[in-house]
């Protein structure tokens, strides 16, 4: 590796560490064409003088760098900007410096504060399929190219969101065909911080087989479906970390905040349409099932403080797994996730039917996961009103003698059995709460549940254990969510 002139000047020559010596060859100079060389003795520079010199040099270097206008990495060439909303653009420069941002004819100017921070907001723009150029001018000029206007989504969570496209069912074919000039990918590296960071080490990339192969499979399939349906550019930001609980993703006010600080905060207030979230396995292992609703609400509320109250937030109900979940914890989390749908602007994709290996916590069928999340966005954000975007969810129950009749939301074109066999995974109980396996039959858009062992039923539950494989779905092929008809205040049982 090369040595800089300053480093070479003070290169260690084997002299005592209390002093650094400059050899005469560095002091040879020319006066009126005559070479003048001091006597061959060494000139000693004390460590204190050296450190003072280097500190001054470092301060000068940092000042020079800070004087230049700078942008966060999320604002760069090849990015996608969210259409139809005001567009924040921000960065850093010398204190008091005037900075102008121009995107085509869209222009705004701001002056930095005493800490060198600046921010402008450009007017909303329409998606037009054209590549745009942005200039950011202060004492220097930054030119960003190949900018598209379209839809921007963030994907976050733990390993099932992080899971690479190349390592999924159909991954080889998906990677081979992942050349989409109008889809752009931004992958945030895994790091934590004690306070909100200003930037991340990442870059926007045009979607092609190489970058897509190592990108989030769920987020890619979600974005690809949106792109196909809307025919507008799509920007996808993946910020996920395998094995992470929900708490580090939550703002420091309501959680530990380490991942939020380093992997979400630097992206804000970059304009987005919404977030998709796939997480919860670690919190089940931590026996947080019953408290997960409060954690989820805190996370959504915290992120919306910066991105806006109308930011959509769609999430995946985690899959059944035969692993180390304690009895009742997975159904408890499912109940908390279902309750989270009461938060405005949210929706849940159910995937109980996508498990090939009940021993694998990572279902490899990611295409339908992304597609089911996309159904929520297409219906709620893009007004595709003819889409059935969810499988059946429990609505109400009615006791009819020794039977209980269950009504559902999102029955779509009607209820059916996925495999053509009698409905499974239904249990029934009386007031004693002792559940037994039950017979269940479809009656129009309702299900009637009964058992010869329970003559005075009061409650039903469905898919209520960690290795369930229920077959109830709607005509559109979307599975019913596990549920219980009675809200228990404590232990949910198994």
List PLM regions with ranges.
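Extreme N-terminal basic, low-complexity initiation segments
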Residues: 2-9
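Cationic, low-complexity basic patches in intrinsically disordered or flexible, solvent-exposed regions
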Residues: 9, 16-18, 26, 40
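Basic polycationic patches enriched in arginine
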Residues: 21-23, 47-48, 66
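Bacterial N-terminal signal peptides
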Residues: 51-61
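Cell-envelope and extracellular/periplasmic
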Residues: 67-494
